[in-house]
C-alpha cells in the first residue's frame, strides 16, 4: 500500500491514521510514521484469544475487552493486542478509543528484534504517558514461556507488580481481580 506524503514535516496525525482504508495489516501510527505489520502468527493469535477469554470471564459489567483495538495515545495511533476499556465508551462504536477510556492494554510480544523493541521499549512508555493504568506483557519466547508481566502506572511510568511463568498462578488485582496460569495461553487446549 502506498501512502501520500505527510502533510507536514512533523509526519502523519491520528486523524490521518483514522482515515486509512481497512486492510489485512495492522497499521499503527508511531512518532508520525505509519508502521505496517502482517497479521500475527497463529501461536500469537491463540495466546491473545485465550487471554481475552480469561480476562472476559472476570470482567465487571462496566468494562469490555477486545483483541486488537485502535487506541489514540497522544499523537500516536496504536493497536494493542488486547484492549480493556469502559463499556459505555466502547459500546458507542468508535473507530478508536481515547486513552482516557482504556483501563488496560496487553501486548503479546511479536518475534523479531524490531517487534520485540516495539513491545518492550517503544509502546509501553507511550501507554504510560497517556495514563493507561495497567499494562500486561506476554512473552512467548524463552525457556520459561509463556511469561506474563503486569505493570501498574506509577509516578515515573509503569512499575512491575506481578509476573508469572507457565506452571504458576498469576493474580491481578487491578483493573479487576483475575487469576490464571500462563500455561493456558499456549499448548493444547485443556478442555
Predicted regions and their residues:
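Gly/Pro/Ser/Thr-rich low-complexity, intrinsically disordered segments predominantly at protein N-termini
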Residues: 1-191
